[in-house]
């Protein structure tokens, strides 16, 4: 049996693709891993693999396109564990390919914005008290080099929609959030960073987008794990990485006014209360 290290990690979107590999690797390193996904069969299959290798994991199902389920997921995490040393917001939707049509979440928001960005924003804020109580701790947001400036006049892309545009906007939103969060948590012992794990990994999401994979999920997992556990990242925060190299994101990520606009909008859309806002 793998020797437990006493730490707990929560990885969203970890029943498939790169998240699955990350969850397994963390379990191999002695982490207690909270696994998340929508598919019960995949979730329990992963638990069986981790248990067979001597690791410890639990499966927490939830559909991140529903903020009711996002809140339920946060409550479940809080009930399951008294500490959270690592949060990896990995769950997401791809571009949907060239024929993608505009879809909305259970709450009426553009689907990729809701799942790729807003769900992680809300989940992170709801889990902050738990994370703060476990400091030093890390938050890793899995983003992309595919980024497009947010149009604050049409965030939900009701005009000129494309799946690619929606995906790129949601991924940049993650980075604005990461930088803002890192600054808010300065001197708390919690770091927040974002990354593009690898280009066109061999995952179902990439293949469904009509793209030929050119990278392996192991490459992407290695980049995520470096941000998650490497001692060389101790104290480094508010950064964006392309693979394992620090990089510059789209210019909007470094615009303080844009970050504030997104934050205010996200608290409103996410239905976060003043007390939840004060968790920062």
Q: Residue spans of the language-model regions?
A:
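Catalytic loop of short-chain dehydrogenase/reductase
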Residues: 92-113, 132-190, 196-211
